[in-house]
Regions:
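Short alpha-helical
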Residues: 12, 65, 109-110
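Conserved acetyl-CoA pyrophosphate-binding loop and the N-cap/start of the following alpha-helix
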Residues: 79-88
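A short helix-loop-beta-strand connector motif used in the catalytic cores of GNAT acetyltransferases and
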Residues: 36-47, 101
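Conserved acyl-CoA
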Residues: 87-102
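Short amphipathic alpha-helix that is part of the acyltransferase structural core
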Residues: 1-30, 126
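Conserved beta-strand in the GNAT
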Residues: 47, 53-62, 69-74
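Conserved active-site alpha-helix within GNAT-family acetyltransferase domains
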Residues: 98, 102-131
Length: 135
């Protein structure tokens, strides 16, 4: 097996994104064209590769100076437990070290301890809200 490599890129095929997102059960994988366009419009995207296979990524949305929202940290199930998610987080946090705020909204409570290891804490009176328009 080849060593895992990491790239800062926003260029993915629709099929690469579809496979990755559906592998972790995320419904947004059913919208690969929108995912591809969304990645291009993101602030920072760091991806993990096994050879030419996309196996993980983390995406940040930001205003360039004050706040970044980390969105989409996902790793193929067969590659989980190999510290790939940790490496992706370390790399994106380094890219955003100058920001005043870095925020994340974990969608699964079981992942909260993972983010706490990087210094994230529950945000006081904040409540995550969503308007889901997937059909």
């Amino acid at each position: 097996m080849a060593a895992i490599t990491y790239r800062e890129t926003k260029d993915f095929t629709e099929r690469e994104l579809e496979r990755l997102f559906l592998s972790v059960g995320w419904e947004s994988g059913r919208y690969p064209e929108q995912l591809r366009r969304g990645m291009k419009n993101s602030g920072v995207v760091i991806s993990a590769w096994d050879g030419e296979k996309l196996i993980g990524l983390v995406r940040g949305l930001d205003d360039g100076e004050t706040v970044a929202f980390l969105h989409y940290l996902l790793v193929y199930p067969a590659y989980q437990g190999r510290h790939i998610g940790q490496e992706l987080m370390e790399r994106i946090l380094e890219k955003y070290r100058h920001m005043l705020h870095i925020k994340i909204m974990p969608s699964d409570p079981k992942t909260v301890p993972f983010y706490e290891r990087f210094g994230f804490v529950a945000g006081g009176n904040y409540t995550a809200m969503e308007l889901n328009q997937m059909q």
